[in-house]
């Protein structure tokens, strides 16, 4: 059986934690920032976990994560 290919776009966007969960960055932090509050921008800077309903799809895209 051949090796599975990794979706490189997904591999750049996700990282695994030590316990095996998947981390991601939040959206809406790249431009149009001047009307957003400092608190909102600060919260958007933090990483969060991929929701369990999407986790299986991410794992299929990154088989060796």
From Swiss-Prot:
InterPro entries from the xrefs?
A: Ribosomal_bL35, Ribosomal_bL35-like, Ribosomal_bL35_CS, Ribosomal_bL35_sf
Give the UniProt family note: Belongs to the bacterial ribosomal protein bL35 family.
Q: Which domain of life is it from?
A: Bacteria
Which SUPFAM superfamilies does the entry mention?
A: L35p-like
Q: List, alphabetically, the GO terms of the cellular component aspect.
A: cytosolic large ribosomal subunit
- Record's protein name: Large ribosomal subunit protein bL35
Disordered: where is this region?
A: 1-28
Q: Which GO terms describe its molecular function?
A: structural constituent of ribosome
- Its GO biological process terms? translation
What keywords tag this UniProt record?
Answer: Ribonucleoprotein, Ribosomal protein
Species per Swiss-Prot/TrEMBL record: Trichodesmium erythraeum (strain IMS101)
What Pfam families would the database entry show?
Ribosomal_L35p (PF01632)
């Amino acid at each position: 059986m051949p090796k599975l290919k990794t979706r490189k776009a997904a591999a750049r966007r996700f990282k695994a934690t030590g316990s095996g969960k998947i981390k991601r960055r939040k959206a809406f932090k790249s431009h149009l920032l001047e009307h957003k509050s400092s608190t909102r921008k600060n919260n958007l800077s933090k990483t969060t976990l991929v929701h369990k309903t999407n986790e299986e799809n991410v794992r299929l895209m990154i088989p060796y994560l």
